[in-house]
Amino acid sequence: MAVFTVNGKTVTAEKNQKLLRFLRDELRLTSVKDGCSEGACGTCTVLIDGKPTKACVPQTDKLEGKTILTVEGLSDWEREVYTWAFGEAGAVQCGFCIPGMVISAKALLDTNPDPSREEAAFAIRNNICRCTGYVKIIDGILLAAKCFREGKLPEAPVDWKVGSRVHRVDVAEKVTGTGQYPDDIYLDGMLYGSAVRSQHPRARVLAIHTEEAKALPGVVCVLTAADIPGSNKVGHLKKDWDTMIAVGDITHYLGDAICLVAAETPEALAQAKALVKVDYEELPAVHNPQEAILPDAPLVHREGNLLAHKHIQRGNPAEALAKSKYLITRRFSTPWTEHAFLEPECAVACPDGDGVLVLSTDQGAYDTQHEIMGMLGLPAEQVKVRNCLVGGGFGGKEDVTVQHHAALIAYLTKRPVKVKLTRAESLLIHPKRHPMEMEFSLGCDENGIIQGVAAECIADTGAYASLGGPVLERACTHGAGPYQYEAYEIDGWAYYTNNPPAGAFRGFGVTQTCFCIETLLNEMADKVGISPWEIRYRNAIRPGGVLPNGQIVDDSTGLIETLEAVKPYYDEAVKNGDPVGLACAMKNAGVGVGIPDTGRVRLVVREGKLHIFAGASCIGQGLGTVLVQTVCGETGIARPDVVYERSNTWMAPDSGTTSGSRQTLFTGEACIRACQDLKKALEEHSLADLEGQEFYGEYLGKTDPLGADVPNPVSHIAYGYATQLCVLDKDTGRIKQMVAAHDVGKAVNPLSVEGQIEGGVVMSMGYALTERYPIDENCRPTVKFGTLGLFRANQIPEIKPIIVEKPGLNVGGGAIGIGEITSIPTAPAIAEAYRRYDGELRTELPLKNTPYAKK
């Protein structure tokens, strides 16, 4: 037992436990987030006697007489200042790391009221952010310091039209910690659930012994596949993922669930899981695509080890390459990458009449609903899903991980339940970025004009399909780069293995093939005798040009403008003798390739305010703010009269998955269409007069399938374009500056766009230089959150985001999604900078022999 002070009140911790658990589970101080419980991420940072401390480290018995402060204990003035400053700076995206950042900022400003930028960055070095790239968080800390010194707050922006730099709609609840992520929910009678996982990557389950676990006091149920009332199979596109492995069936990877346990307390849950015994017949595993392709390879799935093959061809690349004056062929390798979102997967499910209500953190409420419907054998009206705040996704929360398990327990026990992954489970279970082995050949004429490209790509898609097929397809369609030439051919294969699954990850396969084509183009520039900038300018796709996939691009195409935007920075680096690398990229907005892709919005007038309902997840990218700005701009309704509602499946229409950089364009266009009807009604009525009325908008983006035999095929509604460059310090070899110019069509909220660019650049700096996700001979990841190699605030260089607004797109207000492309050209730009630094051509990520490389 220990007695100490929390937020000015004396408290008693009767049992010895982690401070994090005491603050959250007993005091309900949920601003203190559980991001890893390993002392690595900093989301649980509190002040102990004025010193920032990770609450997941100290035991309560060691805190006798201590004084502890959480965000809930800040003064009203402090909360106002941090909310305004972080909003003004654009420091908040998913928000999961922000309360911990605020506490670290307070520790700094209490002792240093006028810190330098370097001091602010150092103060949050133990707080990881995966969204923002830290730039705007540091800006927010410096703004807060200024407000505290001056004793006043400036006015927040009042112009909420499209194009304005506004505070995000959810900034206050994220800064003060009052917003709810699923793990922040505590309900009367709530159970705690978790899965017992496979001990072998590939083994037949012979028996599951649950008797001892069921007999343990506090255990409510132990469920196996035999208890599932509907289908045991789930899967985002292909139903090949087992909810639980049944007796007699074979495991596919170490993350497979064998059974589910639900108990009254977390302690009873942990004890019960340890009592479950499973008999296995161990079987040979498939470790990589090279093994998967062998004629006598074990089958990961009955239908074979090949998930997908993609072949794309236009023109005759073999002939074009043969006639090229210059030809380069290289092999490339890119690694597994962990999303490392700060919020581990969590869901709370409750019985709801004859069905269930699931409170979730994912990238598509309707996708989750459909998975649960199939598993429980229930119609849509009996399965309700509502998004809470989502603590980052980046593609890693498109597949169900805990939602269906929580739903099953709640449905069968008629009790509410929380199912949450530990950080170790999260690192193992959710799909990662595909590792790829690639070979690219590039041919150019004497002027550096691309004649043709031929390529092959092999991807490890892991244990389950997830989105492996579409990821491979996108890698192939975009492997040609954003250039105009007619001869392109690529073959891609994705193979099942017994490794963790691979699926969607920011960039969706394009990060891998972009690394190849851009690296070759930089090398080719030397052969031709021109600069990397010039070779791109000569080949860049322009309005009216034809991409290698056959699509004629429209007037919104802005690649040239991004090249011109970085030119002064490129020339300055060359003039100063600084090693500089350059790369371009393009990325589609929307699903495209003939697949139905729809955005939907419902506007409802309630109690004199307009409520926005869209079944699209906001995962930190700022969709809610985009829709509010759209409504204010289109209708003239004042910001205080507009309410953004979180996604759900009973009131918000299905707006598709938050993926493919699609929501700003597709759901944004749907919102514009709904606003047009509302605006007509407002010509004759006040908003109050329209009480109870609804206004619906829908936009269907029509595209052509790959290989469609039609004139001028349209693979995607829109593309974003980018040019990034990396400047190294010529003495130290460390990155001095990253410049990122992005064509976004129309920047709805430039503050958010800058934050997306900065965050994407830092994420791919890690991809290029430091991040690792090693897997051992037992198909087990050998990594913890703290050893992933994530960049920290005091390690980032100057980042210069440049917003290029090229008009011409006639949907979505001209806005093109930017969530993915920000991470795509970074790695090849960095690789080229190091080639200029030391002459070494690097074709494998993460890059070797740099000052950032692990010793």
Predicted regions and their residues:
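Signature of N-terminal electron-transfer/Fe-S-associated modules in redox systems
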Residues: M1-E155, V593
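Short beta-strand elements
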Residues: V46, E173, G179, D183, ...
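Glycine-rich loop/linker segments at domain edges
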Residues: G90, S164, D170-T176, N305-A347, ...
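Flexible, low-hydrophobicity surface segments
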Residues: A145-H309, L327, L412
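C-terminal catalytic domains of large/alpha subunits in multi-subunit enzymes
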Residues: A225-A226, G377-Q382, L412-V417, E446, ...
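Phosphate/diphosphate-binding loops
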Residues: A257, A263-T265, K414-G462, E669-A688
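Helix-loop-helix junctions that connect adjacent transmembrane helices in secondary transporters/permeases
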Residues: L294-L376, A540-K609, C618, E691-V714, ...
